[in-house]
């Protein structure tokens, strides 16, 4: 009679066979990721091909070391072991190592991190900083023994001697390289003495260049307040540092040229051009003012300054005539008024009233004559003052008494306000004029 086994007994037997079978202790599988959903710790999903599906498990410690993110539909190669789960009688693969099929894990990680940081906006042009034209200090984050620093020093010294180069000696590949690169970028920003920062290294494999693809390096470059030039690998190599840096150079020499956009020879040539332009401008300005001066010295007003007040004299004569006419009119009107009063007095027959009115009339006449005399004297004095004021405008009389008329830009200067040192002034004198330059200005408080 056959012996019947319990389900658990059979399951334990099968588990023992799985665990002791040398072919199942370490299995190599290739398949497509299915039913994947990112979990906080351990990852559970399926691997499938056209004919079968198998459950797989990745413990959290292993998953964190993969170096890339699993995605639904991704084809991967895995190394693991078979495990049977007794309560359900199902088996699965416990993955110990995995990598994308056909393309390296670093390449996948590169694309995934590039996509992530790109979506955050780290590579946008609006964040790129311009390079200064005349840097005084250039920082270099690279290996102290490589050709990169030698090429940069040689190129900068040739293009613009005197620019100081500050080296931040850094490990550029291997464990801890990315952290050191990021730390030195932040250190350079904390000191705030650099105008430009170059980060770079020579060529190599993607593994050799990986320190410049790690997220900590990329974020340190993005956060840098100092403009960063990336010069990593050869011209055909591309790193995430190239995308986030403000400028990218194919070689260390090209990076040094970007950092010193204006050479010493360029600057000397520019200064010579400016000097020539200034000389031409000064010469043209002198010719212009010399021509204006010649025209002024030949003008009628300059040769016959009395014409300056001819119009004022004519106006003074007109005012004098108008004043005399007004006085005559006023006197005539008052005489007429007196006559009217006399007629009225004669019409009033009483002698006392006539006498009173005659006395009043005489008094008014005396007052009128007195007022007329005062008015006349005032008008004559006013005419005399106007005449004297007009004579004071005669520049020939002013300079004849030993004074000089000061002009700036053909305008008469009445105060030291507005006059500065090195201003050019013109002094008009009795027998000529002087062109002078102000050496010192001493103002008096009024």
Curated annotation (Swiss-Prot):
Q: Which reaction does it catalyse?
A: Exonucleolytic cleavage in either 5'- to 3'- or 3'- to 5'-direction to yield nucleoside 5'-phosphates
Instruction: Indicate whether Cytoplasm appears among the record's keywords.
Output: yes
The main enzyme category here is hydrolase
Q: Where in the cell is it found?
A: Cytoplasm
**One CC-aspect GO term:** exodeoxyribonuclease VII complex
Keyword Signal in annotation: no
Catalytic activity, EC: 3.1.11.6
Q: Which GO terms describe its molecular function?
A: exodeoxyribonuclease VII activity; nucleic acid binding
Cited InterPro entries: Exonuc_VII_L, Exonuc_VII_lsu_C, OB-fold_nuc-bd_dom
Q: Which processes are annotated in GO (biological process)?
A: DNA catabolic process
**Main location (coarse class):** cytoplasm
Q: Which HAMAP family match?
A: Exonuc_7_L
Q: Which family does it belong to?
A: Belongs to the XseA family.
What is the role of this chain?
A: Bidirectionally degrades single-stranded DNA into large acid-insoluble oligonucleotides, which are then degraded further into small acid-soluble oligonucleotides.
Q: What is the designated name of this protein?
A: Exodeoxyribonuclease 7 large subunit
What organism is recorded for this protein? Streptococcus sanguinis (strain SK36)
- The gene name reads xseA
């Amino acid at each position: 009679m056959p012996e019947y086994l319990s389900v658990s007994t059979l399951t334990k037997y099968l588990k023992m066979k799985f665990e002791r079978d040398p072919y199942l202790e370490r299995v190599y599988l290739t398949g497509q990721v299915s039913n994947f959903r990112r979990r906080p710790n351990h990852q559970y999903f399926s691997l499938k091909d056209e004919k079968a599906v198998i459950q797989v498990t990745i413990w959290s410690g292993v998953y964190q070391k993969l170096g890339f993110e699993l995605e639904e539909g991704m084809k991967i190669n895995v190394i693991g072991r078979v495990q049977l789960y007794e309560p359900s009688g199902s088996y699965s693969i416990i993955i110990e190592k995995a990598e994308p099929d056909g393309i390296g894990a670093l390449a996948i990680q590169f694309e995934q991190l590039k996509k992530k940081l790109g979506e955050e906006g780290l590579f946008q042009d609006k964040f790129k900083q311009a390079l200064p034209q005349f840097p005084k200090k250039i920082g270099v984050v690279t290996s102290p023994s490589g050709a990169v620093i030698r090429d940069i020093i040689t190129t900068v010294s040739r293009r613009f001697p005197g620019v100081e180069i500050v080296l931040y000696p850094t490990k550029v590949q291997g464990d801890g390289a990315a952290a050191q690169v990021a730390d030195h970028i932040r250190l350079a920003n904390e000191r705030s003495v650099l105008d430009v920062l170059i980060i770079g290294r020579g060529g190599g494999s993607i593994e050799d260049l990986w320190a410049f693809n790690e997220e900590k390096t990329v974020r340190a470059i993005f956060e840098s307040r100092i403009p960063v030039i990336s010069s990593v690998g050869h011209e055909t190599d591309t790193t995430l540092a190239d995308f986030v840096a403000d400028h990218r150079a194919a070689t260390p020499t090209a990076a040094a040229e970007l950092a010193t956009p204006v050479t010493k020879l360029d600057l000397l040539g520019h200064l010579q051009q400016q000097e020539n332009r200034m000389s031409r401008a000064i010469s043209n300005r002198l010719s212009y003012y010399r021509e204006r001066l010649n025209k002024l010295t030949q003008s009628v007003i300059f040769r016959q300054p009395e014409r300056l007040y001819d119009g004022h004299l004519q106006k003074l004569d007109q005012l004098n005539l108008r004043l005399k006419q007004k006085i005559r009119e006023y006197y005539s009107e008052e005489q007429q008024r007196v006559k009217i009063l006399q007629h009225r007095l004669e019409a009033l027959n009483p002698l006392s009233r006539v006498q009173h009115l005659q006395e009043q009339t005489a008094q008014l006449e005396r007052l009128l004559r007195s007022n007329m005399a005062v008015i006349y004297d005032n008008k004559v004095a006013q005419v005399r003052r106007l005449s004297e004021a007009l004579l004071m405008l005669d520049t020939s009389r002013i300079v004849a008494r030993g004074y000089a008329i000061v002009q700036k830009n053909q305008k008469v200067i009445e105060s030291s306000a507005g006059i500065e040192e090195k201003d050019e002034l013109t002094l008009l004198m009795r027998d000529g004029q002087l062109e002078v330059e102000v050496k010192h200005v001493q103002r008096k408080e009024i």
